[in-house]
Amino acid sequence: MPPRRSHKKSRNGCDQCKERRVKCDEKHPICSNCTSRELTCTYLKIPIVSAPGRTAHAVTDRSPDPPHQGQSQLKNQNKQPMSSVVSAEPSFVLRDLELMHKFSTDTFRCLCGDQSDMDDWQVLIPQQASKHTFLLHGILALASLHIAATATETTHVLSYLDTALQYYNMSFVPFRQALGALTPVNCDAVFAQSAIITVIGIALPRLNAQHRGECFSMIENMVSVFELLQGSTKVSRISRPWLKASMFSKYDFWMIETGDLDSEELVAIEKLSRLTTCIDDAEHGSANREAIDLLRSCFAKFARSSHPVAILAWLVYTKKEFIDGLRMRQPVPLLILMHWGVLLNELGSHFWWAMGCGRDLVTELLAEIKSEDPVWEQALEWPRKMIGV
């Protein structure tokens, strides 16, 4: 009988694997077993470990302490028994606690249209995140992005941007899996995550490029956001009966009441519509006209509710053929996107994540669309005026 293969035993597995009595790979912040099962992964029951020659490891992403402070702490630690100082690193590390606190006390507001939304995003959505890993990662990514957007020291900005990118990327696979398996149990979490990735998708690449001195195109970024949200129409279509009885019933774009467009908005949309009609595009014409009709609804609904859903829903419901036209830089889809950029610019005066995005988008599109045709020039006048260039 061959000898048994030796293996290193460990008592440092996560709480969930211990309860299930399965081998834990001890990955941080979330082990592979909990990732695949979409469980909240915790290491709260790890025993205190005494190890000769090891020093205490405080898990924190804050700036290092001043030399004299760190030396003082080290002296105090050396006076204590090693077993009282050294402990295994927790899965839910201090930065994660900081980010969850940031979201539940501040960041949640950037997803609210009015006071009636507050309790949903501050309390109920974090509760949902405890059951769905993709939503937990989305919340942590958005909170980290919020800190990066308001930080002043470059090292802090880049550190929190890295954390935001990490959690943003980690949320994709389980989110896509949930999109493909919608149920009344997970539809709230999927809907919430759709809103979160829209906000992050608009703001994160732009902020990251600015602080790293990289080239960036707001047009390309918006195409990426469109593609990112292509599966989200399924959320609205399939889960609408479930959402009617949930916290998200009031966020249904089609149920938002419409207001009256002002005279300039009416004229601008009519010019856009006439221009699109004059250009015979058999492949994309129908998608372009639908995008304009939807845009008109967005203007009307935002005039009544001022809720971000009234604007962001346009990214979800536009057709694939319209997005293809944007990707190929066709003038008409670009012009339609420019008019939506005016609405995005309006959001920038209310929400930190949209600040400057609409202006950058319209400015870039004005440089992209060049025409000496008077009809085109007239269509460009209103967006140019609205952002002040």
Q: Could you tell me what each predicted segment is?
A:
Residues 18, 35, 140, 144, ...:
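Residues within alpha-helical segments
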Residues 127, 220-389:
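C-terminal effector modules of eukaryotic transcription factors
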